[in-house]
Amino acid sequence: MPLSYPHFRKLLLLDDEAGPLEEELPRLADEGLNRRVAEDLNLQLPNVSIPWTHKVGNFTGLYSSTVPAFNPHWLTPSFPDIHLHQDLISKCEQFVGPLTKNELRRLKLIMPARFFPKLTKYFPLEKGIKPYYPEHAVNHYFKTRHYLHTLWKAGILYKRESTRSASFCGSPYSWEQELQHGSTSLNDKKGHGTESLCAQSTGILSRTSAGSSFQSKFQQSRLGLQQKQGHLANGKQGRSGRLRSRVHTPTRWPVGVEPSGTRCSNNLASRSASCFHQSAVREEANPSLSTSKRHTSTGNAVELNPVPPGLVGSEGKGSVFSCWWLQFRDAEPCSDYCLSHIINLLEDWGPCYEHGQHHIRTPRTPARVTGGVFLVDKNPHNTTESRLVVDFSQFSRGTTRVSWPKFAVPNLQSLTNLLSSNLSWLSLDVSAAFYHLPLHPAAMPHLLVGSSGLSRYVARLSSNSRIYDHQHGTMQNLHNSCSRNLYVSLLLLFQTLGRKLHLYSHPIILGFRKIPMGVGLSPFLLAQFTSAICSVVRRAFPHCLAFSYMDDLVLGAKSVQHLESLYTAVTNFLLSVGIHLNTSKTKRWGYNLHFMGYVIGSWGALPQDHIVHKIKECFRKLPVNRPIDWKVCQRIVGLLGFAAPFTQCGYPALMPLYTCITAKQAFVFSPTYKAFLCKQYMNLYPVARQRPGLCQVFADATPTGWGLAIGHQRMRGTFVAPLPIHTAELLAACFARSRSGANIIGTDNSVVLSRKYTSFPWLLGCAANWILRGTSFVYVPSALNPADDPSRGRLGLYRPLLRLPFQPTTGRTSLYADSPSVPSHLPVRVHFASPLHVAWRPP
C-alpha cells in the first residue's frame, strides 16, 4: 500500500505524538527504511517510456526559451550625464579621512577598469544587430540603432573612426587625454607644428592637424570618408603613408554600405585646419560646410560634418561612391513603394556621419563586432521602455573562456545577522549603475558592437534582394531594396526619428567606454565599487548602517528623522562624486526592509510576497504521476530552493529532485511527495537573527554511542548498530537540542557545524533540519569537549566546563567588512543631537 501523507509526516517525526527521540531518530538513518520510503513515494529514478513533460506552469526547459515580444512603441531610456569623478578617492578622503586598504584596493580596480581577454573572435557587421524579431526587423534595427546612438551621445560608447582612432562625447578622463590625437608632442615630432591646435579647457584637444593627417584619419576607415583609390595617393604627410596599406577598397562594400564621399570632401579635408578655426560669423556665412548645427562641448570641440549633404545629392547622381540613402533622391521611382518617395520628403537629411567631441588613439580596431545586440522590455514591470541586451558570451565559452573573479555574496543567515534590527530603512536606486564605471580605452577593441547599415541589413533579410559585386551601385540594384514592408516601416519611423533615419541607415562600429552588462567582469567590479562606497558611508556615520549588493543600496538609522538627515547627507556625497541617483525611485520601507528578495525586520527574514505567490502557483500547476523533464525540475528547484531555509525540512526535502537533475533523468511527483512539499511551503517560518551567548551544552558521539554535557549534568546512550561517525554526531546534536532546549551547542564535528544536512540519509536529514532549526553551533576541539568522555561510556570523569562564547558572524563576505570609525578630529556629519550616544554596530 502506498505511503500516505499522514503516515509519512509521522515517520519524519513532524507530529507531536512521536515516541522518544533517542529511539525514533536513529531509525531514520537506516538505509533499508530510506530505500522502502523512496520506493513507496516513487522517488527512485524512473526508467519510463512515457514522454516527458517539458512545461509546468511558467517553467520551461532551458532549451525552450520563450520568444520575447517586440513592442513597436518602446521608448529609449534617457541616460543622464553619468560621469564618475576621477578624483573619487580624494573626495572620499575629504569626506571621511584616510581610506582603509580595502577601500583603496576596490576603488583603484575601477579607475579605470581593465579587460584583456586571451582571445577575441571578430564577427562580420551583419551580426551586429541580432534578428530577434523577424516580423519587425526594420523597426527593431532602427530602435536598436537609436539606443546605441543615445549611449554614444551619453559618453558610454566610443565610436570607431578608423583602425586606430575613436571619438566620444562627454567629459574625458586623464588616461584618455594621454591617448589624445592632437597632443603637442606628437605633432611636434611629426613636424606639423602647434599653430593648428585649439587649446581646450578640459585638457583634451580636438584633432585639427593640417590637411592630409585629418584626411587620412577618415580615408583609412571603412566607415568614415573614403575616396577613390586615386585620391588616397594624395596624402603624403603625417601617418597617411603608413596607413595606406590597411585601406579597404570601396568596391568591397555592397550597395548601400558604401561610405559617403564625394569629390568635394578632398577639398574639405585639405581645409580642415582653417575650418576648425573659423569664427561663428564665418560659419554662418558659409553654411555649405555643414547643414547640421555644430555642437560645442565644454572643451569647445567643434563637430565636423565632413560631407555637405546638399553636395552629395547634386554630385551623387551617377556616382558609385555616393551615400546609398541619398542616391534615391534623383532616382526614378520604381513603384508606389519606392524609397525615393520617402527620401524626397526632406530637402536636408543632415550629415551621413557624426563625430564625437573628443578623439583618441586606440589599439588596432578591425571593422568588425565582438558581440550582437537586441532589445527587450526594461523589466517585467516596465514594458514601455526598452533595455539593450549585449551578447558577449564568447568570453564565457570554449577553451579560451575568461575565468571571472569570484566574490562572496552574503548568505541568508549572514544577511539576517547584519540587517535584522529595529532600524528604519530606505533603499536608493542608482541610475544605470554599470555605466558609471569607466573602462580603459585599450579594452575597446574587445567589446565592439554596431550595425552594417540599413541596406545590407535589409538585403540579408529579403530573399529577392541579392548583392552582386558587378552590379555594385547600379540603379537596378539600388531598387532591389524597395518593398512595401520596408516602405511602410520607414514611413512610420519617419514620424518619430525624422532625418535621423539617414544617419542611422549608415554602418557604424562602437566600442564600450564604460563597463557593459554582458561581461562576467562587470558584476564583480560593480559589487566591489558599491561595497567600498558603503564602507566609506558607514565610517562617516558610525551610528547608522549602509549596505549594498550590486546596485541596490540600503541605509538604516534609529529614527525616521535621523534617516532623512542621513539620506540628505549621503545623497549629496554620492552626487558630489558623480554617482547618479534616481531620487524618484527611493523607497522608504519603515522597519521592514525589502532587500535581495527577502523582507527583513527585527523578527528575522522571510521571502517577499511575490516569491510566495510564485511558489503557490507552481504547486497549483504541478502534475502528479507524470515524468517531468529534469531541465524543468531545475527551474522548480531554483524557486523552491530560495525559500527552503524558511521551511521545516529545508534543503534535504528537495534532495530527490536534486538527485534526478544530477542523473539527468525525468522526475515523477507522487501525490504524497507533492503533498509533503506543498505543506512545507505553505507554512513558512522566519529565519531569526543569531544572538551572542555562552555555550553550556556540548554533544559528542562515537560510531556506537553518544554523550551530552548539559551544564554540570552528563548523559550517555548507545546505538542499536554502529553508525557512520557524521551520522552519529548529527544524532547527538539533535538529542542535545531536544533535551536541553539550548540554541547554542558545542560540537567537534565540522559537518554538523556546517549545518548542511543534504549528505545524510534522506529521512534523517529532513527530521534533523526541523529539530536543529534556529540552533547555532560552536566548534570545540575534541580534547576539550566535556561530552567526549560520556560518549565513550565514561560518566565518572568530569572535564571542566568551558566558557565558550558564541559571536554571530556576518559570514565570509567581501561585501561587508567591519569599518573602523572615523578619526575624531573630523567634524560631526549629522548636525543635531544623535539619538545614540555610542556608535551603533550591526548586531
Curated annotation (Swiss-Prot):
Keywords: DNA replication, DNA-binding, DNA-directed DNA polymerase, Endonuclease, Host-virus interaction, Hydrolase, Inhibition of host innate immune response by virus, Inhibition of host RLR pathway by virus, Magnesium, Metal-binding, Multifunctional enzyme, Nuclease, Nucleotidyltransferase, RNA-directed DNA polymerase, Transferase, Viral immunoevasion
PROSITE patterns found in the cross-reference section: RT_POL (PS50878)
Residues bound to Mg(2+): D429, D551, D552
Highest rank taxon of the organism: Viruses
Coiled-coil ranges (or none): none
GO BP, sorted A to Z: DNA replication; symbiont-mediated suppression of host innate immune response
Region (Polymerase/reverse transcriptase domain (RT)): 347-690
Region described as Spacer: spans on this chain: 178-346
InterPro entries from the UniProt entry: DNA/RNA_pol_sf, DNApol_viral_C, DNApol_viral_N, HBV_DPOL, Rev_trsase/Diguanyl_cyclase, RT_dom, Viral_Replic_Matur_Polypro
Region described as Terminal protein domain (TP): spans on this chain: 1-177
GO molecular function: DNA binding; DNA-directed DNA polymerase activity; metal ion binding; RNA-directed DNA polymerase activity; RNA-DNA hybrid ribonuclease activity
Positions of the UniProt region annotated as Disordered: 284-308
Record EC number: 2.7.7.7, 2.7.7.49, 3.1.26.4
Reaction catalysed by this enzyme: DNA(n) + a 2'-deoxyribonucleoside 5'-triphosphate = DNA(n+1) + diphosphate; Endonucleolytic cleavage to 5'-phosphomonoester
Annotated control of activity: Activated by host HSP70 and HSP40 in vitro to be able to bind the epsilon loop of the pgRNA. Because deletion of the RNase H region renders the protein partly chaperone-independent, the chaperones may be needed indirectly to relieve occlusion of the RNA-binding site by this domain. Inhibited by several reverse-transcriptase inhibitors: Lamivudine, Adefovir and Entecavir.
Site (Priming of reverse-transcription by covalently linking the first nucleotide of the (-)DNA): Y63
Domain Reverse transcriptase residue range list: 357-600
Domain notes per entry: Terminal protein domain (TP) is hepadnavirus-specific. Spacer domain is highly variable and separates the TP and RT domains. Polymerase/reverse-transcriptase domain (RT) and ribonuclease H domain (RH) are similar to retrovirus reverse transcriptase/RNase H. The polymerase/reverse transcriptase (RT) and ribonuclease H (RH) domains are structured in five subdomains: finger, palm, thumb, connection and RNase H. Within the palm subdomain, the 'primer grip' region is thought to be involved in the positioning of the primer terminus for accommodating the incoming nucleotide. The RH domain stabilizes the association of RT with primer-template.
HAMAP family per UniProt: HBV_DPOL
Family listed: Belongs to the hepadnaviridae P protein family.
Function of the molecule: Multifunctional enzyme that converts the viral RNA genome into dsDNA in viral cytoplasmic capsids. This enzyme displays a DNA polymerase activity that can copy either DNA or RNA templates, and a ribonuclease H (RNase H) activity that cleaves the RNA strand of RNA-DNA heteroduplexes in a partially processive 3'- to 5'-endonucleasic mode. Neo-synthesized pregenomic RNA (pgRNA) are encapsidated together with the P protein, and reverse-transcribed inside the nucleocapsid.
Other observations noted: Hepadnaviral virions contain probably just one P protein molecule per particle.
Entry protein name: Protein P
Species per Swiss-Prot/TrEMBL record: Hepatitis B virus genotype F2 (isolate Argentina/sa16/2000)
